């Protein structure tokens, strides 16, 4: 039941409604994710999320995927407070995921507008990435995104050598600083929208 009238501009078979009173806070610490054919962690909740002190080893797709899906699977909507800290990512996203990125913020919105972000307040701090040259971060429709004090080591695989480390699509308020990027890494960023 709703505590007030449903807005008249909602369209049947077009808009989605989420019961945000039934969404969890999530804390994932001291875990070891390995050799999955899919992503290591799929996360979508509007409440507080902490993913810290974990190891992600050779996840087939993105080690961490943050969705926001109202197109196919109808998973939870936007995230508003995510901390990804002190994790180790080794050889992840070798077989797929959004842009083959180790961490992907990939909501399903079809219209990408930096003034109308889906996700907010995502901090990726103090992690170690050992990657084969694929992107460490793909973010779409995200506001107030921080990527700092991370260490990125790239191996010499020709498969992903041309991929930028960061791909940002319709994002606003992005801070990427104080990171250690090994020389072999392609330090390019790609901006879309």
Over which residues does each language-model region extend?
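Small/polar beta-strand repeat architecture
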Residues: 1-30, 34-35
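Non-cytosolic beta-sheet module surface loops
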Residues: 4, 55, 128, 139-141
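Short, recurring structural edge motifs at helix starts
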Residues: 14-17, 38-40, 70-75, 106-114, ...
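Parallel beta-helix/beta-solenoid
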Residues: 23, 28, 36, 41, ...
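Short glycine/acidic-rich loop motifs that flank beta-strands on beta-rich extracellular proteins
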Residues: 37-44, 60-67, 89, 93-101, ...
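Active/binding-pocket-proximal capping segment
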Residues: 46, 56-62, 67-71, 81, ...
């Amino acid at each position: 039941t709703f505590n007030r009238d449903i807005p008249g501009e909602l369209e049947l078979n077009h808009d989605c409604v989420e019961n945000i009173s039934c969404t969890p806070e999530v804390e994932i610490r001291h875990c070891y994710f390995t050799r999955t054919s899919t992503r290591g962690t799929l996360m979508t909740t509007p409440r507080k999320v902490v993913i810290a002190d974990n190891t992600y080893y050779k996840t087939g797709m993105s080690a961490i995927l943050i969705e926001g899906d109202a197109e196919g699977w109808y998973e939870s909507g936007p995230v508003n407070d995510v901390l990804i800290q002190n994790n180790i990512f080794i050889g992840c996203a070798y077989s797929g995921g959004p842009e083959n990125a180790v961490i992907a913020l990939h909501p399903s919105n079809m219209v990408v507008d930096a003034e109308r972000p889906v996700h907010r307040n995502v901090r990726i701090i103090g992690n170690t990435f050992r990657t084969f040259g694929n992107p460490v971060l793909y973010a779409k429709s995200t506001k107030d995104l921080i990527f700092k004090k991370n260490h990125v080591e790239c191996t010499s695989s020709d498969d992903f050598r041309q991929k930028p480390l960061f791909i940002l699509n319709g994002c606003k308020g992005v801070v990427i600083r104080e990171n250690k990027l090994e020389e072999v890494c392609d330090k390019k960023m790609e901006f879309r929208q």
